[in-house]
Every structure is written in C-alpha cells, then in structure tokens.
A protein has these predicted regions:
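Core dinuclear metal-dependent hydrolase active-site scaffold
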Residues: 1-39, 47-124, 131-133
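Histidine-centered catalytic micro-motifs
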Residues: 44
Length: 134
C-alpha cells in the first residue's frame, strides 16, 4: 500500500486492488487522466456539487461499501457542535492489502463512543491538522 499527500486536505491511498482519493478539491478529473480504472473518490462532507460523477464511484456519506475489491467503511461523526448543528463528517476506513487506513476528515467535535467503536483499531490514521474540532 502507498499513501500520498496530494496537497491541502487531499490524500491518495493506493493498494493492489484500487485507489481511494480522499477529499479531492475542485471538479473531478477527466477519466482519461486517471491511471487506475478502480479509483474511488470519498468526501468527508457532502457540501459541494463538484462531487457528482457518472465516470467514478463517489462516496459522500456513512455506510459500508465494497467496490472492485476495496472495502470502505464510512462512520458518521459531528461536523459541528452537535448542540447547534446536525451536519455530519464522515470518517472513512479503507481495508486493503491487510491494512486499515482511517481518514478523520474534518470533525467538528469529539466523536461519540459508538462512532469510536465503529472506527475500531486502525493501522494508519490520517488527520487534518487544521480541523476545528481537534
């Protein structure tokens, strides 16, 4: 597995079965520019219309996904103070090549005990150091 920082909040997790691009900024790239046909884009929040695509698998919320051999879990956590907002941040856990990689996204406050339990044990944790909730 290879993990690369692509700038700002964007990371690439490349495994033997596919690629996960986390929080890609701007419009999705032209499919001919993407090297791996099994590329999945995941977003910790769904507040941008540029995330819609007919060419790529795009995940924008919690759930369990199996895409081309990639196992991806999205766990809901608060994007803001839960007392004032119901917006969610999705923590994604990619399970590939025998490793679990978790991307915290942009949490707005501490996750619940249930969310922490769903995230569980991970091998690599990617944290946005500019997140307001850290």
């Amino acid at each position: 597995m290879e993990i690369r920082w692509l700038g700002n909040f964007t990371f690439e997790v490349r495994s033997s079965v596919g690629v996960v691009i986390v929080d890609y900024e701007g419009k999705l790239p032209n499919p001919t520019k993407v090297k791996d046909a099994n590329t999945v884009f995941v977003y910790s929040s769904d507040d941008d219309e540029d995330h819609v695509s007919n060419d790529f698998q795009v995940l924008t919320g919690p759930g369990e996904y199996e895409i081309g051999g990639l196992s991806i879990r999205g766990v809901a956590t608060p994007a803001d103070d839960p007392a004032i907002s119901r917006k969610i941040n999705t923590v994604y856990i990619v399970d590939a090549d025998g490793l679990q990689v978790a991307m915290l996204g942009n949490p707005g406050s501490q996750p619940s005990a249930q969310s922490v339990q769903q995230i569980s044990k991970v091998d690599v944790l990617i944290i946005n150091t500019e997140s307001q909730g850290l």
